[in-house]
Amino acid sequence: MAFSGVAQAAAAKDNGAKADAASVPTAYEVSILYADRTWIWKDGAAYFGKNGRSLRAWTSREGAASVGQGKWIATRDGKMCMDLAWRSKAYTGQQNRTCYSHRIKGGNIEQRKDPDGEWYSFKRSPEDPADEYRKFEPGDTKAAQFEESSKLIDSKN
């Protein structure tokens, strides 16, 4: 994968730093992780568009589908933020921002949900079966499910 060397390159930037020190990936490095990929969740998925940084997501819990549409950004302080407005048959929500921070530590990428989530392994070098990043698929692999959920929500019945 093209990104596998980014963690190592970033670790090399801090040549004189302690082995335990963490560095922050650039906005470009963070964007490589997400652009044109689908993040598979237990009960849905989110697609991070490449051009214009569009974002769409869907969930289906206990027979109740929800879809979210908006944008995503990568920041220079190592964050990926999702600005999504969720809707279902029962509600139409306001746009909300959810951010995840990233850091590179020991050649591995860690992630946490902001503002105060626990750091966990996101992408290790070499890859590990427990990595969260293994839930990402190249391309828009769940577009059909998103469209199906949208039609269900928008139907009058």
Please report, for each region that a protein language model flagged, where it lies by residue.
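Bacterial N-terminal signal peptides
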Residues: M1-S4
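Lipid interaction determinants
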Residues: A7-Q69, T75-N157
